[in-house]
Amino acid sequence: MYCPFCRNPDSRVVDSRMADDGSAIRRRRQCPECGRRFTTVETTSLSVIKRSGVGEPFSRSKVINGVRKACQGRPVSEDDLAMLAQEVEEQIRASGAAEIDAHEVGLVILGPLQKLDEVAYLRFASVYQAFESLEDFEAAIAQLRHEAQEDAAERPATPRKPEKTSL
C-alpha cells in the first residue's frame, strides 16, 4: 500500500476493525518513511454479469432504483429501500460468489420485497418474471395467500386476556 503523503511503497498496519456490518475491513496504517498515519477500507469485489455478458460492480443504488419504481405510491420509505438493498447485498455476499448473474440478483430481491410490501412485490415480479396474462397475476396472488396462511398456522395462538367485568 503506497503512502498517500510520501508515496513510499510500504506501510505497517497499526489497527484493523470490521466496518459496514462486517462487509469491509478498516485498517489504520503507518508509513515507516514519513511516520504519518492513514486509513484504508478493504472490501471484496462483487460483480454482476448482465445478459450481454458484461460485468459491472454490484450497486445498492441500482437495487434501490429498481425497487423504488415498484414501490411508487406505496407506504415504503427510503430507509426501507436502503435496508432492503443491504439485505440483498448480504444474501448475495453470503453465497460466497464473486460474480452473480443479474437474473439471480432479481430473484434475491423478491424475498425481502415480499416481506416489505406485497403490492410492490407483485409489481416487481410482474415485470421481472414477465407476467403475460391475468392468470400469471392470479397464480402469484394465490401463492402469496397460501404463504400467508402457512405463516398464520405456524404462529402460536396468543391467549386472550379475560375481559374485566364491572360489578
From Swiss-Prot:
Residues 148-167 are annotated as: Disordered. Binds 1 zinc ion. Negatively regulates transcription of bacterial ribonucleotide reductase nrd genes and operons by binding to NrdR-boxes. Keywords: ATP-binding, DNA-binding, Metal-binding, Nucleotide-binding, Repressor, Transcription, Transcription regulation, Zinc, Zinc-finger. One of its GO terms (biological process) is negative regulation of DNA-templated transcription. Belongs to the NrdR family. This is Transcriptional repressor NrdR. A zinc finger (unnamed) spans 3-34. Pfam families: ATP-cone, Zn_ribbon_NrdR. The keyword Transcription regulation applies. Its cofactor is Zn(2+). InterPro entries: ATP-cone_dom, NrdR-like_N, RNR_NrdR-like. The lineage of its organism: Bacteria, Bacillati, Actinomycetota, Actinomycetes, Micrococcales. Residues 46-136 form the ATP-cone domain. It comes from Pseudarthrobacter chlorophenolicus (strain ATCC 700700 / DSM 12829 / CIP 107037 / JCM 12360 / KCTC 9906 / NCIMB 13794 / A6). GO terms for molecular function: ATP binding; DNA binding; zinc ion binding.
